[in-house]
């Protein structure tokens, strides 16, 4: 049977009979560069994407620090203003659901969403600490499905690793290898194959297994095969 949603968490909620007419699935449309945080008095929400990419930023030492990429295989709890924000790296759309509703309907989805986000944050930290910036850039650009995307230098998903000069050198290395082309201040992917060879693989390997981490929705589905 064809899935209704690309995001496995939304599909799970839908499969459990929670159609959009039964509670306020708030539809979202966003464009690159927009940012949001939750007002202190607002109802906590989980955001699930159907397209686009967000980056989660947390506040450390009074500065916003990027800590995780959020795509269509993941959900994120919208942080309070005092904790950080989410920012759109690509145009997209999705749905916002009250946390309390998700918890009451399917606590497994809430648990798996939290666990997936922790894994994503751990991968981000490991990647930025252990891999060279050209590898990091290639991996994140590949994860974000960039075949027809043109980046500006200030929107590249480099995660604050190094300096702007280091980012320029990393882009030049990708260009010399034939992965990207720099023209008019924009960075265009010209070879996904070269980009894949240069990428460290941290985020792309995580994305391949993310959908499988969601637990079955009913006790019968969780029973081992006879």
Per-range role (PLM):
Residues 27-28, 37-39, 44-50, 67-68, ...:
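His/acidic/aromatic-lined binding-pocket segments of jelly-roll/cupin-type domains
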Residues 63-119, 123:
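Cyclic-nucleotide recognition modules
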Residues 107-164:
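Polybasic "coupling" helices that flank or enter modular domains
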Residues 35-41, 57-59, 78-79, 126-129, ...:
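Short histidine-centered beta-strand/loop micro-motifs
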Residues 142-226:
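Phosphate-/nucleic-acid-contacting segments
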């Amino acid at each position: 049977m064809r899935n209704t949603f690309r995001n496995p968490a939304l599909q799970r909620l839908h499969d459990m009979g929670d159609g959009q007419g039964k509670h306020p699935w708030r539809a979202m449309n966003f464009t690159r560069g927009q940012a949001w945080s939750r007002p202190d008095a607002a109802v906590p929400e989980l955001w699930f994407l159907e397209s686009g990419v967000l980056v989660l930023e947390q506040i450390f030492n009074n500065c916003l620090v990027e800590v995780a990429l959020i795509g269509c295989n993941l959900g994120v709890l919208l942080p309070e203003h005092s904790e950080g924000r989410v920012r759109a790296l690509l145009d997209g759309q999705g749905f916002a659901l009250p946390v309390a509703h998700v918890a009451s309907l399917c606590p497994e989805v809430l648990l798996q969403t939290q666990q997936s986000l922790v894994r994503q944050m751990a991968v981000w930290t490991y990647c930025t600490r252990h891999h060279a910036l050209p590898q990091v850039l290639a991996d994140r650009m590949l994860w974000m499905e960039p075949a027809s995307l043109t980046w500006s230098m200030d929107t590249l998903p480099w995660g604050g690793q190094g300096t702007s000069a280091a980012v320029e050198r990393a882009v030049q290395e990708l260009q010399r290898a034939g992965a990207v082309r720099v023209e008019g201040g924009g960075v265009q992917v010209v070879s996904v194959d070269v980009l894949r060879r240069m990428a460290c693989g941290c985020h792309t390997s995580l994305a391949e297994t993310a959908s499988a981490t969601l637990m079955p929705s009913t006790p019968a589905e969780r029973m081992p095969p006879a």
